[in-house]
Amino acid sequence: MSEPSAEGQQTILVVDDEAEVRALVREVLVMHGYNVIDTGDPFEARRIVEAQPIHLLLTDVVMPIMNGLELAKRIEAISPTTKVVLMSGYSTAAVKGSGRPMISKPFKANDLVSTIRQMLDSKSAFRRPGPPPAPKPGFGPL
């Protein structure tokens, strides 16, 4: 695991059970000025998010302890402003149906950085589709 962020830098938490993937992602993102914290343990990821601000969670989908979709839900529950990007070597219906941005493994460094930048520059975090708002009283069909 790396050190906490320097003031002014955006912090990205990378969660992947493969140390080689974490090392590669770290190298690419640090070269582009991001502060990177990484772990192979989704439960440690949760503790990290509870302890400090994380701007973006980059998580593998297929992991032995907890899948990335479940981790994303748990992180969003405790830190709604943390943005999420999924990584996967598989493009399953569940991943596609999640509505979250996904980086396919193996990935190109430029694609990784572009996706991360786009998410961090966006104005809002991922929002699961919910029911439409209730109509206001007195404003029914005319």
Task: Name every feature range the model reports, one short phrase each.
Residues 33-40, 48:
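Short hydrophobic/Thr-rich beta-strand motif most characteristic of the beta2 strand and flanking loop
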Residues 105:
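A Lys-centered signature of the CheY-like receiver
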Residues 40-44, 67-71:
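Acidic catalytic/metal-coordinating carboxylates
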Residues 63:
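Receiver (REC) domain active-site loop signature in two-component systems and cognate sites
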Residues 23-31:
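Charged docking surfaces used in two-component/phosphorelay signaling
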Residues 1-13, 26, 73, 81, ...:
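Non-catalytic signal-transmission and effector/linker regions of two-component phosphorelay proteins
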Residues 60:
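Active-site residues of response regulator receiver
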